[in-house]
């Protein structure tokens, strides 16, 4: 009687493949994200309301807790915008519990092509604020962001987000 080596091999590959995929996802997709939050931008002056206009006096604030001060962290900011955003770059004033900074970054290249991730009519631009940020202690922290552009009412910005990621392995 002749055995079919191919069918035995195929019957072993299925469970082996599933096991390898599960092991990969359990070890490599462990979340080191400590905080991730988006805040929608909206403007209202009583007569007019808009969900994609950011007033220069409007501050977006994120409050979060650091439970482990040992590792360093990555601080990322995200700006979501539409094609209505009129400029190539953007200036932001960023303040956290420990310091403040003025940041310039580009949303479009020299040819006017949007940078970042495009999906569903929005463009999401990640901006690395810090790659090895060390918190002095555990506790509550805050991060505030407001735009520093010349327009008092900046159109095309829909959301601002912050993500804090623990560096390294435990």
Residue ranges and their predicted role:
Residues 93-96, 150-170:
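Exposed low-complexity, polar/acidic, P/S/T/G-rich flexible segments that act as propeptides
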Residues 2-17:
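Bacterial N-terminal signal peptides that target proteins for export
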Residues 25-28:
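C-terminal motif of bacterial Sec signal peptides marking the signal peptidase cleavage site
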Residues 58, 94-97, 102, 138, ...:
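Coil residues (strongly favoring Ser/Thr
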Residues 57-79, 88:
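Contiguous beta-strand segments within globular domains
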Residues 103-134:
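An anionic, turn-rich surface loop/hairpin at beta-sheet edges
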């Amino acid at each position: 009687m002749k055995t079919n080596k191919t069918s035995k091999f195929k019957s072993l590959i299925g469970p082996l493949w599933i096991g390898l995929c599960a092991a990969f996802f359990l070890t490599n997709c462990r979340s080191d994200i400590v905080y991730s939050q988006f805040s929608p931008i909206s403007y209202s002056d009583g007569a007019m309301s808009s969900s994609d206009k950011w007033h220069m006096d409007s501050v977006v604030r994120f409050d979060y807790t650091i439970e482990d001060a040992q590792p360093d962290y990555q601080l990322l900011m995200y700006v979501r915008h539409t094609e209505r955003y009129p400029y190539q770059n953007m200036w932001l004033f960023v303040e956290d519990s420990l310091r403040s900074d003025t940041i310039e970054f580009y949303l479009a290249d020299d040819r006017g092509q949007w940078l970042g991730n495009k999906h569903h009519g929005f463009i999401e631009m990640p901006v690395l604020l810090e790659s090895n940020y060390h918190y002095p202690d555990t506790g509550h922290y805050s991060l505030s962001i407001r735009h520093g552009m010349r327009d008092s009412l900046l159109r095309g910005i829909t959301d601002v987000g912050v993500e804090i990621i623990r560096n390294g392995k435990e």
